[in-house]
Design a protein with these regions (language model features):
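Anion-binding (especially nucleotide phosphate/pyrophosphate-binding) glycine-rich loop
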Residues: 2-130
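FAD-binding subdomain of flavoenzyme oxidoreductases
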Residues: 121-123, 132-160
């Protein structure tokens, strides 16, 4: 049986768009369309969506789009944008910050400063998100994400 994304529209109606134009999702305002665009509001919904597509589609997780060049050719897969609950930021204790992957680097830097935590200053001028910064080990001024990262929680393409 062939997998069809259209079958998921009733279940994910507000957050799943087919044949989606990606131009406005990156800072360069360039690029073509994606076969599908899914906006994940929370972890539970993301897991549910990933389990439904069951590795039948290519996946690209898009952060702020600040360091992303999108081809004019159609992306034959699903672009996932993490929103809402992935923007959470809090203190675990006096020395450790928990930040969602959609938190901007600038916001993480400001949060650290407001809570008297040093070492995050370099993030104030990096345009992007925590998730993207970790993926590419973003950095400047001789500091990188590897210098502030303790651990991550991640999902695989199967939602586990």
């Amino acid at each position: 049986m062939k997998f069809n994304l259209k079958e998921l529209i009733p279940e994910f109606s507000n957050n799943l768009k087919l044949d989606y134009d990606l131009k406005k999702k990156n800072w360069f305002n360039i690029g073509g369309k994606a076969k599908a665009f899914y906006k994940a509001d929370n972890l539970k919904e993301l897991i549910k969506f990933l389990k439904k597509i069951q590795n039948n589609e290519k996946i690209f997780v898009l952060g702020a789009g600040s360091n992303t060049l999108i081809s004019d050719k159609q992306f034959n897969g699903v672009v996932i944008k993490l929103t809402n609950n992935f923007n959470n930021i809090s203190l675990l204790n006096e020395e450790i910050i928990i930040a969602g992957s959609a938190v901007t680097d600038k916001l993480l830097s400001e949060f650290a400063m407001e809570n008297s935590l040093g070492g995050f200053e370099f993030l104030s001028c990096i345009p992007g998100t925590v998730g993207g910064g970790i993926k590419m080990n973003a950095g400047c001024f001789n500091r990188e994400f590897k210098d502030i990262l303790i651990s991550i929680q991640a999902l695989n393409k199967s939602g586990q």
